[in-house]
């Protein structure tokens, strides 16, 4: 599903980004509050709890554990550097790391955006992840919703595309990333779908968010474009 959306945007993009909103919610309340595992986690290889909940190891909570995936998706589809960030982070249930995030971004090209992350209750939506990316550019807009298996594109010339996707098209394949890495190493893929540049954009966006939450003010990137 994501690759189909990426290929559509490569064929016809939405122009200069003006606004982007990213929303994610997953069942991490127990995990990040030291009260239980992540649903669907392997029972054979259980990581130490502090892998997730000791900030010295994890660097944070929901942002590091989950929003890294959301940002990776967003910047894969619409690459853009973050110039400024302002973030609120919440740690209910006496959690040692944050369970919820509300972040505002200003991108290097002047566009603005929001990133929202929430630790859902176990059992909600049958533990199905929620992840949505919406972007508006000067030549069109798109909405990618993995939870509802929806991919919609609209362009100023009147073109409208509503992709037909099978059930569970947005489901996570736990082995896909590892298999893709092996394929890249073997030369079996024409392109690396997770290049270093994508990782750098994601890390920079998260780093600024955590800086802002810690300082209580806008964090500004010191890296020149």
Place the predicted regions along the sequence by residue.
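An acidic site on a long C-lobe helix of protein kinase domains
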Residues: 1, 16, 66, 99, ...
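Predominantly a Rossmann-like dinucleotide-binding segment in NAD(P)-dependent oxidoreductases
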Residues: 1-93, 216
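Short aromatic-enriched loop/helix-cap "lid" or pocket-rim segments at secondary-structure transitions
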Residues: 2-5, 29-36, 97-99, 127-128, ...
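Active-site donor-binding loop signature of nucleotide-sugar glycosyltransferases
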Residues: 22-24, 117, 165, 223
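Contiguous beta-strand/loop segments that form the cofactor/metal-binding neighborhood of enzyme cores
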Residues: 65, 69-149, 176-189, 222-225
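C-terminal helical cap and adjacent loop that interface with cofactors, partners, or active-site loops
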Residues: 70, 143-147, 160-225
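A short, polar/proline- and glycine-enriched secondary-structure boundary/capping micro-motif
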Residues: 124-129, 153-164
């Amino acid at each position: 599903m994501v690759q189909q959306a990426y290929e559509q945007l490569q064929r016809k993009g939405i122009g200069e980004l003006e606004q982007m909103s990213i929303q994610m919610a997953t069942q991490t309340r127990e995990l990040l509050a030291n009260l239980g595992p992540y649903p669907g986690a392997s029972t054979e290889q259980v990581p130490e709890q502090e892998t997730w909940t000791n900030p010295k190891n994890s660097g944070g909570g929901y942002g590091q554990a989950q929003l890294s995936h959301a940002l990776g998706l967003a910047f894969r589809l619409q690459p853009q550097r973050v110039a400024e960030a302002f973030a609120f982070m919440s740690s209910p249930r006496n959690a040692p790391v944050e369970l919820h995030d509300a972040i505002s971004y200003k991108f290097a090209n002047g566009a603005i955006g929001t990133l929202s992350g929430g630790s859902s209750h176990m059992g909600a939506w049958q533990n199905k992840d929620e992840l949505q990316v919406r972007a508006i550019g000067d030549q069109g807009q798109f909405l990618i919703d993995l939870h509802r298996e929806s991919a919609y594109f609209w362009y100023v010339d009147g073109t409208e595309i509503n992709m037909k996707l099978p059930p569970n098209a947005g489901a996570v394949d736990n082995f896909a990333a590892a298999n893709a890495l092996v394929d890249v190493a073997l030369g079996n893929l024409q392109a690396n779908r997770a290049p270093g540049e994508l990782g750098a954009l994601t890390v920079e966006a998260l780093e600024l968010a955590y800086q802002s939450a810690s300082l209580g003010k806008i964090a500004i990137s010191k890296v020149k474009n």
